[in-house]
Amino acid sequence: MNIKYFLIFLILLAVTSFTLFSGCTGFAGNTPETSGKNSNVESIENLVPDISNNASDVLYQVSTIDALLLGVYDGVLPVSDLKTHGDFGIGTFDGLEGEMLALDGNYYQIKTDGIAYPVSGEITTPFATVTYFEADETFRLEKSANLSELEDFLDLNLPSENLFYAVKVDGNFSYVKARSVPRQEKPYLQLADAVSSQSVFEFENVSGTLVGFRTPEYVKGVNVPGYHLHFITENRSAGGHVLDLEMEKGDAALDITSIFLMELPASGDFYNAELGQNLQEDLEKVEK
């Protein structure tokens, strides 16, 4: 299936914005101001070709979470292509078959048996979010915490709630509740109905890694606002989409991703999906 690139929006850190616009110093005189604007446009245009591959500050996404909620499950991008945009991330696979987790450049498909299978490059994804992970902030977690408490702790250490963050937590867990969803057949059910057949796994006294993202509230409909985490065991053998956890201690790392690039399906069910609805209740049902 052909893929068409859409640059949805570009978010730059304040220091970058200041640098780009430093040429616009005042309103007196048209020549300097016009020159500054032209150089700004050129700077942004020159940046676009550089952000599609191998950029640690780019969060790259395939399709939207609302499209997935509405049952747009046909894969549109091979994992071999997805790997050129990141070595860390989460998502799902063609037909909603299992949970995707990428860590240290290795991609895994966690199926309904809870096993994490290494992924071949030919399998496709209908929805995924990836980046090249480079930690900007690190924290030591010494106290036990449930999922909500862990998220609150991370929130307290965010430079801003308005940026995108890749989140990695290595730790010891007394309990992890995770899930995976079986492959769906057409006509596809919406995701809130498809998860009724999910498999739930419970891990006890296990070491492993949480992989995921924290996205701002203003991307509702595009991605999952707040935290979206998947889990994989330390030996990379099992895991799933995180529903609940009890963490004993660990190390957290945040990667600030100040640029957001999204690729949308160029045909298929996405074209006719009734996007723009308020699907918050469905999202909460699916995520919890």
Curated annotation (Swiss-Prot):
NCBIfam families, per database record: acetolac_decarb
Tagged with keyword Lyase: yes
Protein name listed in UniProt: Alpha-acetolactate decarboxylase
Top-tier EC class: lyase
Superkingdom of source: Archaea
Keyword Lyase carried by entry: yes
Involved pathway(s): Polyol metabolism; (R,R)-butane-2,3-diol biosynthesis; (R,R)-butane-2,3-diol from pyruvate: step 2/3
Family from the record: Belongs to the alpha-acetolactate decarboxylase family.
InterPro entries per the UniProt record, alphabetical: Acetolactate_a_deCO2ase
Family annotation (Pfam families): AAL_decarboxy (PF03306)
EC number(s) recorded for this UniProt protein: 4.1.1.5
Gene Ontology annotations of biological process type: acetoin biosynthetic process
Keywords, ordered alphabetically: Acetoin biosynthesis, Decarboxylase, Lyase, Signal
Reaction equations catalysed: (2S)-2-acetolactate + H(+) = (R)-acetoin + CO2
Gene Ontology terms for molecular function: acetolactate decarboxylase activity
Free-text function comment from the UniProt entry: Converts acetolactate into acetoin.
Range of residues in the leader sequence: 1-23
